[in-house]
UniProtKB/Swiss-Prot annotation:
UniProt GO molecular function: DNA binding; DNA topoisomerase type I (single strand cut, ATP-independent) activity; zinc ion binding
Reactions catalysed according to its record: ATP-independent breakage of single-stranded DNA, followed by passage and rejoining
Active site as annotated: Y298 (o-(5'-phospho-dna)-tyrosine intermediate)
Region of interest (Disordered), ranges: 328-357
Zn finger (C4-type) location: 577-603, 617-645, 658-681
E.C. number(s) listed in UniProt: 5.6.2.1
Residue numbers marked as site, Interaction with DNA: H33, R139, R140, D143, Y148, W155, R300, R488
Protein name as catalogued: DNA topoisomerase 1
Family to which the UniProt record says this protein belongs: Belongs to the type IA topoisomerase family.
Annotated ranges, domain Topo IA-type catalytic: 129-557
Gene it is expressed from: topA
């Protein structure tokens, strides 16, 4: 029997660590939190200094029993949950359930799950850091007080199943504020003039810049006519050439927020998926002969700091692969996170390259690991050097300008370039070699009318970035917050951008009217600052809670008395119930919209909303192929005659048969291209854009 018991959150993490520690250690998983506030009641005594009432989470009884059995037999119990506030709280709850000594040095933390890091952490166990626990408790109790007081009011006055929360309500506000900006936006006319110029055999483009040596706004067609009237023929002169060398530094290694943003843009991953895959990489991958190893450092962090050991290893790799000139000469600029002395997200070893790891990883694991690895290695590489040139092209009072750039030294761009929501500006644009006084010919002068555009709706990446910039929430809260406002049907995705629903706007208006603090950005930011102060030991958690609740409970009382009941009318479905003849209406359920009888509860008939794709079922040739959604919201195709016909396909049938085997053809999407393939054999048609 092992003398030492180690408790971690997950079986995957337990399996990895046990291999490192040897036979004297037994490592078991708590399966996350074992204690929490009860779901059936508030669980916070507002009359007794906000004392929380923690209970064993439903279904965790057998886990707790197993933990107690092993703890009783062990000489030493070590708590090795994750190295953040949440992990510290899990360790504290475990110590209470197992009745461990408060002053016992039994807490071990490591930022990466590698043999050296884990063994080193066990040489330096410490006491549970109660300031971190209290910061987590304060957040949990705050969220419980808000949710359990506002939600019943919304259920009573608006609709059952609604919720509001400190972070989710601000996230919803951001989406709605942006939508209102778009609705209120008044487009303004403007024009641009682009010219195509020729010098010898080279052609290049330039834009109108000045009229009579001053900026001249092209607001209307009259302005255009004024400029075109001033032009005299097609001959222009180069009146100024400005050459500069520009340095572009690599982006810092990932934080939680920047990882979620970049994975959304480059890999099309949702925030929740990014965190799930990152957790797998952190907790350990079976590398066969090398054993199970955590491939990345802890993935919930707001720090860009890198350890000296990791920097040295990256420098060695870069020197060997690219040469000394590609290594960074800059001093470290990484920021320390607000939550503890974490590092940025990086590979646990630069020497474990994505290509070497590919055979051990799933497709998603490989893509995310490659992104993390390349971003980190690039962050330790030399800047890129760009040669820029600006040409002023003049005729009389009219001046055009052409800007060009070429890459002189690629540096980090050899490996990795950060993407943006908008078009990146790092593309090469070569201009012919021209000197002041050279003559060029205009081959085309083209005015174009434009209108100003409203601000774009939020993508998931942009919403995460905005939440981080405003200091709303923490690395661990971004993904669940975005998930919640979608599950509650407060927002929906259209073309990968968030649009508020009618329900979302109704809930927002009520929260805005009766609980203004909850959606106030400054209030939410100040609360995060107070939580940080609790973690640093500068203020007690009870004082923070009391400062909030004393005014909040008055808002709750006012809302209960004054908020008017709002009736949300169901959308007509346009057909009658086949059971009782009453009109069918469209309802919103857990997995999206569905049809239900308006005569509920007397009639409980429901139907899925199906969308025909205009193709006959290839199996029965009687029903139509309709688009449906799985419980995980994935689109699939079935027969309208179901259950009589059980045809099903993940790919969209196109209504034609394969010329090779006569089975049905489908559209198969791979990234940004769509291919027509056979559902049965290897027949393929050319990819379509």
């Amino acid at each position: 029997m092992a003398d030492n018991l180690v408790i971690v959150e997950s079986p995957a993490k337990a399996k990895t660590i046990e291999k490192y520690l040897g036979k004297k250690y037994k490592v078991i998983a708590s399966m996350g939190h074992v204690r929490d506030l009860p779901r059936s009641q508030m669980g916070v005594d507002t009359e007794d200094n906000y004392e929380p009432k923690y209970i064993t989470i439903r279904g965790k009884g057998p886990v707790v029993k197993e933990l107690k059995k092993h703890a009783k037999k062990a000489k030493n119990v070590f708590l090795a949950s994750d190295p953040d506030r949440e992990g510290e709280a899990i360790a504290w709850h475990l110590s209470k359930i197992l009745e461990l000594e408060d002053s016992k040095e039994n807490r071990v933390v490591f930022n990466e799950i590698t043999k050296d890091a884990v063994k080193e952490s066990f040489k330096n166990p410490r006491e549970i850091e109660m300031n971190l626990v209290d910061a987590q408790q304060a957040r949990r109790i705050l969220d419980r007080l808000v949710g359990y007081n506002i939600s019943p009011v919304l259920w009573k006055k608006v609709k059952k199943g609604l919720s509001a929360g400190r972070v989710q309500s601000v996230a919803l506000r951001l989406v709605i504020d942006r939508e209102n900006e778009i609705r209120n936006f008044k487009p303004e006319e403007y024009w641009i003039i682009e010219g195509e110029f020729r010098y010898k055999k080279s052609k290049f483009n330039a834009k109108f810049l000045h009229y009579k040596n001053k900026p001249f706004k092209l607001k209307t067609k009259k302005d255009i006519e004024k400029i075109t009237a001033a032009l005299d023929g097609d001959q222009f002169e180069i009146t100024n050439v400005t050459k500069k060398e520009k340095t572009r530094n690599p982006a810092n290694p990932f934080t939680t927020s920047t990882l979620q943003q970049e994975a959304a843009r480059k890999l099309n991953f949702k925030a929740r998926k990014t965190m799930m895959v990152a957790q797998q990489l952190y907790e350990g991958i079976d590398l066969k002969k090398q054993g199970t190893i955590g491939l990345i450092t802890y993935m919930r962090t707001d720090s860009t700091r890198i350890s000296d050991t990791a920097k040295a290893e990256a420098k060695q790799y870069i020197t060997d692969k690219y040469g000394e000139s590609y290594t960074s000469k800059r001093k470290a600029s990484g920021k320390q996170g607000d939550q503890d002395a974490h590092e940025a997200i990086r590979p646990s070893s630069t020497m474990r390259t994505p290509d070497d790891m590919k055979s051990f990883l799933t497709k998603d694991q490989y893509r995310l690991y490659k992104l993390i690895w390349e971003r980190f290695v690039a962050s330790q590489m030399a800047p890129a050097i760009l040669d820029t040139v600006s040409l002023d092209i003049t005729q009389g009072d009219i001046k055009f300008r052409a800007n060009g750039q070429t890459i002189k030294f690629k540096g980090f761009m050899t490996l990795y370039v950060e993407t943006k929501d908008d078009i990146d500006s790092e593309k090469e644009n070569k201009l012919p070699k021209l000197e002041q006084g050279d003559k060029v010919t205009a081959t085309q002068i083209e005015p174009a009318q434009h209108y100003t555009q409203p601000p774009p709706r939020y993508t998931e990446a942009r919403l995460v970035k905005t939440l981080e910039e405003l200091k709303i929430g923490r690395p661990s809260t971004y993904a669940p917050t975005i998930d919640t406002i979608q599950k509650r049907n407060y927002v929906k995705l259209e073309s990968k951008r968030f649009v508020p629903t009618e329900l979302g706007e109704i809930v927002h208006e009520q929260v805005k009217e009766y609980f203004p603090e909850i959606i106030d950005v400054e209030f939410t930011v100040n609360m995060e600052t107070l939580l940080d102060k609790i973690a640093e030991g500068d203020i007690t958690w009870r004082k923070v809670i009391d400062g909030f609740f004393s005014s909040f409970k008055q808002d709750v009382e006012r809302a209960e008395e004054e908020m008017e009941k709002i009736e949300i009318k169901d959308e007509p479905a346009g057909e009658d119930c086949e059971v009782c003849g009453s009109p069918m209406v469209i309802k919103m359920g857990r997995y999206g919209k569905f049809m239900a009888c308006s005569n509920f509860p007397d009639c409980r008939n429901t139907k899925a909303i199906v969308k025909s794709i205009g193709v006959k079922c290839p199996k029965c040739n009687d029903g139509d192929v309709v688009e449906r959604k799985s419980k995980k919201n994935r689109v699939f195709y079935g027969c309208s005659k179901y259950p009589e016909c059980d045809f099903i396909s993940w790919d969209k049938p196109i209504g034609r048969d394969c010329p090779k085997c006569n089975q049905y053809l489908v559209e198969n999407k791979k990234g940004k291209t769509t291919q027509v393939i056979c559902s049965n054999c290897d027949y393929k048609e050319a990819a379509q854009k």
